Swiss-Prot record:
The active site is at 120 (o-(5'-phospho-dna)-tyrosine intermediate). It is found in: Cytoplasm. GO terms for cellular component: chromosome; cytoplasm; DNA topoisomerase type II (double strand cut, ATP-hydrolyzing) complex. Its EC number is 5.6.2.2. The gene is gyrA. This is DNA gyrase subunit A. It catalyses: ATP-dependent breakage, passage and rejoining of double-stranded DNA. One of its GO terms (biological process) is DNA topological change. It comes from Streptococcus pyogenes serotype M18 (strain MGAS8232). The keyword Isomerase applies. Heterotetramer, composed of two GyrA and two GyrB chains. In the heterotetramer, GyrA contains the active site tyrosine that forms a transient covalent intermediate with DNA, while GyrB binds cofactors and catalyzes ATP hydrolysis. It holds the Pfam family DNA_gyraseA_C. Few gyrases are as efficient as E.coli at forming negative supercoils. Not all organisms have 2 type II topoisomerases; in organisms with a single type II topoisomerase this enzyme also has to decatenate newly replicated chromosomes.
């Protein structure tokens, strides 16, 4: 048997209809503000409920639970938590530009702390909130039934100031959202007045009086083009940046102090984010982060390491954290019951139109009230003019109804007038009372004439709106908090914040790197101490020295065939006596990975050039410098190495240079690099020298005929030979003898080309470092034994050596382009 209470419906149709009904309910009745008063229904009901409850600024605070319960029971049946959260937000100085609720107790913080439970807090309306409800009892707005028909509530509040602009709005509806920023009260009122005075004004002209948002938390707005676009179209984006300053402590360290955060930014989350970035090494140079905020204001301190640049770190903080954010305008509001994206001008026009309606309705209400009172007074005056006759009619009437009828008939009075005469007390029959009534009647006639004039003249309505807003401005306006910066925010690179200056980069044999100002280096050079003033220990020495600029890019090639990049300014600056920073703190090197060569990749010097790679197994490769323009933070493969092979060094070449390669068994090969075509980064390369059994490459250099070839053997023998003794041949051969290897002098430790003025630093397998000038080493023929250049212990052997600058040389003599390779043999 079919149940007559069941109705068959199409599921698809029902879903569409029900969802549309739900969506429109959320859009119109919950999530979006009305363009007229700038309030969502929940905020409007809270303020109206508080007003009806008498929780006004001149009365004591009331428990929040009482307020939310009253609002929920009468007007907003959606749960007390949503009502309380909305009320809390209206009481937070960092959320509302002008708070509409005066909270007493814990109402949260801008650190994201929640408010105390509603049973613990108290609230009342703020003074400016009264301006939203002023004249609500004068028929200025329409009322509607509440959800169950037991109460009446306003459809919209009179809103005597442009609240939508002043406090903004945020909300997410179904398929749409609104995000309207707050503005300065005085500027918003001035903008409304400008439109009333100059209806044809443009958005740009409006921005002369309302230049941009004014957030309660202050901060900086970077640039104005985004503001103009948003005001013109209702949609746009601006960049908000924290207000910061860099302080210098008494110890000379720098610290970044944040005093204002962008609107809506959680200070605690920023703190956690910065700490996490520092721990993950994504942000170097920060030693501590403290929140020193108090009742006196926000103070967020970021301590900077002594050698780090606070300006660079601050720039990275803007890039990586919420110290700089984007605020996206989406000025969506309810206009005539329909959600619509509105421009600034449309918001103001709607507000002006609404205020005209409010003033007209209020004026009509006052006029009707005055006319009703004047009507009564007119009857009283008639009665007083015929007092004896009136008294006689009343005395001779059996009932008040008969008396009222007689009075109406005799003096042509209305029912209300006759009733007022009957209700009049005897004391009002005196002559003085008659004068008072006459005076009140005359005043009412003047008032009625004035109110009628207002209704007849639209310009007077405009004047009233302006005068009343000026009074609100005088009482509640305060200075702008958000500063508008001229010019757009640029995506600044760190080097934009670093002064370009000439510097020296040094890398020690043990991997300590630092940056020195060249001026300081020159000063200590004149003192005659040379590179000994570079702060290394007795068991360490400067192995790489590069003259560069703070804006230049340095490439670091490792024995694993990888390349890393650093800007010179990213290398910490130290004094000349300081040791420096372990390079593993700057580059993500793997275990056993060491820097073989540092090359300055300045575009002017590397344009059209190539990198020439040489490996321990005799493989060579030439790759254009342009292949290395984009190097990731964790490095890039520079060449593919075979198993067991290592990169010996990298040379910056012109494409037509001669190259000489030396091997451990004392052979060398010289060839022109043009015989090798340019290859990609992933290529392995070609054979540069054919190695004998158990042989390996120990050095490679660019070579010119006016240079000399310096070789040093494991047992402390060395010699210089003219480059002309090394003929240019094809690559890939076994090479010719460059030294006569015997048990006496030992295998070749390294080969390098020299000009004859350099010093060399030699290190043994015992860690002993010996320094001597190249000129002290004898010149001999190519296939000779060499001469003893240093005395070694019985079990000591030379494992590597490198060229360094002579102690008495000037800065101009430093070999900045690093033509010569560094002889290395660390794997033994």
């Amino acid at each position: 048997m079919q149940d007559r209470n069941l109705i068959d419906v199409n599921l698809t149709s029902e879903m569409k209809t029900s969802f549309i009904d739900y969506a429109m309910s959320v859009i119109v009745a919950r999530a979006l503000p009305d363009v007229r008063d700038g309030l969502k229904p929940v905020h409007r009901r809270i303020l109206y409920g508080m007003n009806e409850l008498g929780v006004t600024p001149d009365k004591p605070h009331k428990k929040s639970a009482r307020i939310t319960g009253d609002v929920m029971g009468k007007y907003h049946p959606h749960g007390d938590s949503s009502i309380y959260e909305a009320m809390v937000r209206m009481a937070q100085w960092w959320s509302y530009r002008h708070m509409l609720v005066d909270g007493h107790g814990n109402f949260g913080s801008m650190d994201g702390d929640g408010a105390a439970a509603q049973r613990y807090t108290e609230a009342r309306m703020s003074k400016i909130a009264l301006e939203l409800l002023r004249d609500i009892n004068k028929n200025t707005v329409n009322f509607q039934d509440n959800y169950d028909g037991s109460e009446r509530e306003p459809v919209v509040l009179p809103a005597r100031f442009p609240n939508l602009l002043v406090n903004g709005a945020t909300g997410i509806a179904v398929g749409m959202a609104t995000n309207i920023p707050p503005h300065n009260l005085a500027e918003s009122i001035d903008a409304v007045k400008m439109v009333m005075e100059h209806p044809d004004c443009t958005t740009r002209e409006l921005m002369e009086v309302i230049p941009g948002p004014d957030f309660p938390t202050g901060a900086l707005v970077m640039g104005r083009s985004g503001i103009h676009r948003a005001y013109d179209t209702g949609k746009g984006s601006i960049v908000l940046r924290s207000r910061t300053e860099i302080e210098t402590t008494q110890t000379g360290r720098e610290r970044i102090v944040v005093t204002e955060f962008p609107y809506g930014v959680n200070k605690t989350k920023v703190h956690e984010h910065i700490v996490r970035l520092a721990q993950e090494k994504r942000l170097e140079g920060i030693t501590a982060v403290r929140d020193e905020s108090s009742r006196e204001g926000v103070r967020f301190v970021i301590e900077i390491r002594r050698e780090a640049s606070a300006t660079v770190i601050l720039n990275n903080l803007f890039k990586l954290t919420s110290l700089q954010t984007n605020f996206s305008f989406n000025m969506l509001a309810i206009e005539n019951g329909v959600p619509k994206i509105l421009s600034l001008r449309q918001i103001i026009d709607n507000y002006i139109s609404y205020q005209k309606e409010v003033i007209i309705r209020r004026t009509r209400f006052d006029k009707d009230k005055a006319e009703a009172r004047a009507h009564i007074l007119e009857g009283l005056l008639i009665a007083l003019d015929h007092l004896d006759e009136v008294i006689a009619i009343i005395r001779n009437s059996e009932t008040d109804v008969i008396a009222q009828t007689e009075l109406m008939s005799r003096f042509d009075l209305s029912e209300r007038q006759s009733q007022a005469i009957l209700d009049m007390r005897l004391r009002r029959l005196t002559g003085l009372e008659r004068d008072k009534i006459q005076s009140e009647y005359d005043d009412l006639l003047a008032l009625i004439a004035d109110l009628s004039d207002i209704l007849a003249k639209p310009e007077r309505i405009i004047t009233i709106i302006k005068e009343e807003m000026d009074e609100i401005k005088r009482k509640y306006a305060n200075p702008r908090r958000t500063e508008l910066m001229v010019g757009e925010v640029l995506s600044l690179e760190d080097e934009d914040l670093i002064e370009e200056e000439d510097v020296l980069i040094t890398l020690s044999n043990k991997g300590y790197i630092k940056r020195l100002a060249q001026d300081e280096f020159r000063a200590q050079k004149r003192g005659g101490r040379g590179v000994q003033g570079t702060g290394v220990n007795n068991d360490d020495f400067v192995r790489e020295l590069v003259s560069t600029s703070t804006h230049d890019t340095l490439l670091f090639f490792t024995n694993f065939g990888r390349v890393y990049r650093l800007k010179a300014y990213e290398i910490p600056e130290y004094g000349r006596t300081a040791k420096g920073l372990p390079i593993v703190n700057l580059l993500k090197l793997e275990d056993g990975e060491t820097i073989q060569t540092i090359i300055n990749a300045r575009k002017e010097e590397t344009a059209g050039k190539s990198f020439f790679f040489t490996t321990k197994q005799g493989i060579v490769k030439r790759t254009e410098v342009s292949e290395f323009n984009n190097i990731r933070q964790n490095g890039l493969r520079a060449l593919k190495l075979k198993e067991g092979d290592q990169l010996i060094n990298v040379l910056l070449t012109s494409g037509q240079d001669d190259i000489i390669i030396g091997t451990h068994s004392g052979y060398s090969v010289r060839f022109n690099e043009a015989s090798i075509r340019n290859m990609g980064r992933s290529a392995t390369g070609v054979r540069g020298v054919k190695l004998r059994e158990d042989d390996r490459v120990v050095g490679a250099s660019r070579i010119r005929d006016n240079q000399e070839v310096l070789v040093i053997t494991e047992n402390g023998f060395g010699k210089r030979t003219s480059a002309t003794d090394y003929p240019t041949k094809g690559r890939g051969g076994k090479g010719i003898k460059t030294a006569n290897i015997t048990p006496k002098n030992g295998q070749l430790a390294g080969l390098v080309t020299v000009d004859g003025t350099e010093d060399i630093m030699v290190i043994t397998n015992k860690g002993v470092i010996i320094r001597t000038n190249v000129a002290n080493i004898s010149q001999t023929g190519r296939a000779t034994l060499g001469v003893k250049i240093m005395k070694l212990d019985a079990d000591a052997k030379i494992v590597t050596f490198t060229l360094v600058q002579p102690e008495d040389s000037s800065i101009a003599e430093i070999n900045t382009d690093r033509e010569n390779s560094i002889s290395k043999n660390k794997d033994n």
